[in-house]
């Protein structure tokens, strides 16, 4: 599928950055850090910039739809933020692909190239953006690469100046139970306690929860009380900002 098709955003709205991994304090900004304000973007001039962190999963798709239905308001702009790991190729459809597979099994199918994975990632994130496009919300797609997904996500959220960030998860710690380091779960837990802006975690409803999603809201930050008012139909868990 071509991300440039009419059902997807134009390619200039999709940027995959390959910057060196920042190993510095959240309060230190390097002059070499690329600026999202260098050129006009679809989010310029928005009253609020709402981030939705996505990992190409069904949970992320649900989080985007929830944000459209319950959180995003006229005048807002949305940034779909994806951090792609550098050490392992990971995709919702491909699954984790350790680099040692071909060494262990010479008969294994050739692994996708980095270019293939970049194209796959851009297409999948563009698919996630469809609800935003359908309702006319301005948005852009921001993709970066780093081996430390949790820290990089928090750094990008701060650098982009987001008013709030929404992400999907089946529950904190779900990632650890599955033994994967690529999906939101403990990532969302880390963001709840380290991001500089309010964080809303929408847990994909399962058989235990019933049809109503569980929404976890990080306390702190000034976000006009939007979370409580907008998602009154969902069960809430509140976490104090440490």
Swiss-Prot record:
Bias type Low complexity, positions: 31-44
Keyword Plastid: yes
Record bears the keyword ATP-binding: yes
Residues that, per the record, bind ATP: 19, 83, 168-178, 186-188
Entry-linked Pfam families: Usp (PF00582)
Annotated region (Disordered), positions in chain: 1-45
A Gene Ontology biological process term: response to molecule of fungal origin
Transit peptide: 1-43
Location of the protein in the cell: Plastid, Chloroplast
PTM comment: Phosphorylated by MAPK3 and MAPK6 after pathogenic elicitation (e.g. bacterial flg22, Phytophthora infestans zoospores and xylanase).
PANTHER family linked: OS01G0783500 PROTEIN, UNIVERSAL STRESS PROTEIN PHOS32
The name this protein goes by in its record: Universal stress protein PHOS32
Source organism per UniProt: Arabidopsis thaliana (Mouse-ear cress)
